[in-house]
């Protein structure tokens, strides 16, 4: 099954349930290493990335049981006896590098191949390594591997040159068992950072300030296993909000956190979409006169880079000129080439894309170049004339569970072959 076929022109209606956040679950799975005990993740999304990082943990002798029927993951890291995970697995998923902090903190040594993931630009690991070095780890890089050793990590003050989510998570996990106090300045503020801190604190860590630009961590001696339910996936929610907008439809989302979605809500509201939230549910009505806007991706609480491609898809359907500026990754406009094959008028100028919206799109074969690009091409297919064939859908499966089934339930004519 390597294609998703979308026959455009159908309006959407009904309800869709949003999964818990992939970008919370991946670091939480990594953090389970710190306890040496059993941790249970409830309401876990059944995604390819989740399966890969689970296999990474198995490759260092952890026990990981994935209960797909009940969306539960049970992790027992008490018998870890290998300090080098399978390199082929690590190369599949960039988030595999998140186990470095927990492994060094608990065991004092670790070796890992350079990580993989979506090809959306250079995402250097230097911030991770500089921070781990500041905590006392001796770092060596060579022949495609990173090796770290430390008798015992010691707390320190760390300033991140950029508020990297992965570096913030890795250093936070490394510091919880370090001796003394650690302060991470210019830390990432994403909701997933807060969720990881909540998980770690429930294990017995002492973390204050997660979700702000300064995180204080007082090291503790050990951590215990816990049960945790992650936050909702704000990017999946944003994708379905955009699906309602691009099809000029009205749908209900169940499983949202309005606070986490504020940047997306603000921009869609500016476009003309009507959004009403009640508790953890949201009504999104795109059946209004929509107008072009300018968007600039920024670290949270700015507009998320992970919603850039989907929003570009929406803007191609709105008459007028929009400008999208990508400030996080330098190579995240590959979907524009595929959208142009469908009839979109998009011009790339460095880190900006100029969209002359309103052209009718025509279905054709397009390639999902990365996770969010794949979702964006499906959105284009929902409104294109004729049939759109999206290939390389393994990218999409990394972050969306059964996206075609969820859209089918809303009335879209979409299927997988």
From Swiss-Prot:
Its EC number is 2.5.1.7. The active site is at 118 (proton donor). UDP-N-acetyl-alpha-D-glucosamine binds at residues 94, 123-127, 306, 328. The modification 2-(S-cysteinyl)pyruvic acid O-phosphothioketal is found at residue 118. It is an enzyme of class 2 (transferase). InterPro entries: Enolpyruvate_Tfrase_dom, Enolpyruvate_Tfrase_sf, MurA_subfamily, RNA3'P_cycl/enolpyr_Trfase_a/b, UDP_GlcNAc_COvinyl_MurA. One of its GO terms (cellular component) is cytoplasm. Phosphoenolpyruvate binds at residues 22-23. It catalyses: phosphoenolpyruvate + UDP-N-acetyl-alpha-D-glucosamine = UDP-N-acetyl-3-O-(1-carboxyvinyl)-alpha-D-glucosamine + phosphate. It is found in: Cytoplasm. Keywords: Cell cycle, Cell division, Cell shape, Cell wall biogenesis/degradation, Cytoplasm, Peptidoglycan synthesis, Pyruvate, Transferase. Pfam families: EPSP_synthase. Signal peptide: none annotated. GO terms for biological process: cell division; cell wall organization; peptidoglycan biosynthetic process; regulation of cell shape; UDP-N-acetylgalactosamine biosynthetic process. GO terms for molecular function: UDP-N-acetylglucosamine 1-carboxyvinyltransferase activity. Its main location: cytoplasm. Pathway: Cell wall biogenesis; peptidoglycan biosynthesis. Cell wall formation. Adds enolpyruvyl to UDP-N-acetylglucosamine. Belongs to the EPSP synthase family. MurA subfamily. This is UDP-N-acetylglucosamine 1-carboxyvinyltransferase 2. The gene is murA2.
């Amino acid at each position: 099954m390597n294609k998703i076929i979308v026959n455009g022109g159908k309006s959407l209606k009904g309800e869709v349930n949003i999964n818990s956040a992939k970008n919370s679950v991946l670091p939480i799975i990594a953090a389970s290493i710190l306890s040496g005990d059993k941790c249970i993740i409830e309401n876990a999304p059944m995604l390819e990335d989740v399966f890969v990082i689970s296999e990474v943990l198995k490759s260092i002798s952890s026990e990981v049981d994935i209960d797909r029927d009940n969306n539960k993951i049970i992790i027992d890291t008490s018998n870890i006896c290998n300090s080098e995970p399978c390199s082929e697995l690590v190369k599949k998923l960039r988030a595999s590098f998140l186990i470095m902090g927990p492994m060094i903190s608990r065991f004092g040594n670790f070796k890992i191949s350079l990580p993989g993931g979506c090809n959306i630009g250079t995402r250097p690991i230097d911030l991770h390594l500089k921070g781990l070095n500041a905590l006392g780890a001796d770092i060596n890089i060579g022949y495609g591997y990173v090796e770290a050793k430390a008798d015992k990590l010691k707390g320190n003050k760390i300033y991140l040159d950029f508020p990297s989510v992965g570096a913030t998570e890795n250093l936070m996990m490394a510091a919880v068992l370090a001796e003394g106090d650690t302060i991470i300045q210019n830390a990432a503020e994403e909701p997933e950072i807060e969720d990881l801190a909540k998980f770690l604190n429930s294990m017995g860590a002492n973390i204050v300030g997660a979700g702000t630009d300064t995180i204080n961590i007082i090291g503790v001696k050990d951590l215990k296993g816990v049960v945790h339910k992650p936050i909702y996936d704000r990017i999946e929610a944003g994708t379905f909000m955009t699906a309602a907008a691009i099809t000029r439809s009205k749908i209900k989302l169940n499983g949202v956190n309005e606070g986490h979605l504020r940047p997306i809500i603000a921009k869609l509201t500016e476009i003309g979409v009507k959004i009403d939230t009640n508790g953890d549910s949201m009504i999104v009505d795109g059946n209004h006169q929509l107008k072009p806007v300018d968007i600039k991706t920024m670290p949270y609480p700015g507009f998320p880079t992970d919603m850039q491609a989907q929003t570009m898809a929406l803007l191609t359907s709105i008459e007028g000129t929009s400008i999208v500026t990508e400030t996080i990754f330098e190579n995240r406009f590959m979907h524009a080439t595929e959208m142009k094959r469908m009839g979109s008028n998009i011009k790339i100028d460095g880190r900006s894309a100029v969209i002359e919206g309103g052209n009718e799109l025509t279905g054709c074969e397009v390639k999902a170049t990365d996770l969010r690009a794949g979702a964006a091409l499906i959105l284009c297919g929902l409104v294109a004339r004729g049939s759109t064939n999206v290939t390389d859908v393994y990218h999409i499966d990394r972050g969306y569970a059964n996206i075609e089934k969820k859209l089918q339930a809303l009335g879209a004519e979409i299927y997988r072959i």
